[in-house]
Amino acid sequence: MKAARLFGKNDLRIQDIPVPEIAPGEILLRTGAASVCGTDVRMLQHGHAHATFEAPLVIGHEMAGTIERIGGDVPGYTVGQRVCVAPNYNPVPSQLTVSGNGHLDPNYRALGIHEDGSFAEYVRIPSHAVQQGNVFPIADHVSFTEAAMVEPMSCVYNAYEKAGTRPGDIVLIIGAGPIGVMHAKISKLAGAGKVIINDVHSERLEMARGIDSSFITIQGDVRDEIKRLTGGAGPDVIITACPVPEVQTLAVEIAAISGRIVFFGGLPKDRAVVPLDSNLIHYRQLVVTGTTRQSLRQFQATLALITEGALCLEDLVTSTHPVEDTEKAIAAMANATGLKSRLAFAS
């Protein structure tokens, strides 16, 4: 099979490798679609501890496809079934898995991060992931493209739950990449009175408006326009959907009284210490939190929204590539020349 394997920093190779063998309790997925994440971009640009010259890694963790083979008796699944896969699983149960927070367990593992993932024609789904319920059947009318994007959208759903967006809220999303637009979509679905997207890239703001003309977009410095749009009150909800330290400082400074701020975009390790005015948090009663990954419950809820037609994600895809052009797909994301890149595979 063809696979995109990371050997180290800026060393991604398309290779023909054997189709994975599966053990009892495992599932072999024939990939239908795999989408590119910012994590894939960073892994290529900076390298990763689990991708080395001696032990290269098939990257990619957003996936959907068809069950090609099942190892033994795995109740609930059949060969030929269309599914999408949550990539994060827990090989050893813990209190966090019991409480539904297995995605926060420091000992978690993920396809495409710790072991071979979705940028290949076939993916082995480990038995622990199968037993945990990470393989979700998808309806016939849901495309593999949308099903693969349940993973990033469910990360956004996690942030939506933390933010507690209510009807009539003014929501500011800083970052107009695919994740930022996903935040905008779910904010509108939640009944937000105004959904405002801020970014430095005019092309991405234009794409966001093309997806939904009700989105209000602001390029560059946001302060004056936010004052005008909110009557000086500030946004009720602010999502920082970009890896920029100054944006986190800004969010605390411009949030409304009793505002909720979610730090969604992680920061580079050498820039993760950020100045925040704690008096603003104190006297304005701000709630400042962060989110990462998603629980299986949130993954399932997101899939349901897509299945029921409440959320459409197809319009986020701006480039499609064969697996041989994985590096081009990643470059399109890295250069902000579009929104979401996907890899398409033969049916």
Which residues make up each language-model segment?
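C-terminal hydrophobic helical "lid"/dimerization subdomain
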Residues: 249-253, 292-347
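Short glycine-centered segments of the SAM/dcSAM-binding site in methyltransferase folds
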Residues: 82, 170, 259-260, 287
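NAD(P)H dinucleotide-binding glycine-rich loop of Rossmann-like/cofactor-binding domains
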Residues: 91-174
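Glycine-rich cofactor phosphate-binding loops and adjacent beta1-alpha1 units
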Residues: 163-164, 206, 211-285, 346-347
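Short N-terminal strand-loop motif that marks the start
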Residues: 1-63, 123-125, 129-132, 346-347
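Mid-domain Rossmann-like dinucleotide-binding core that forms the NAD(H)/NADP(H) cofactor-binding site
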Residues: 79, 83, 140-220
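Glycine-rich beta-strand-centered segment in the early N-terminal region that forms part
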Residues: 20-34, 48-98, 103, 136-139
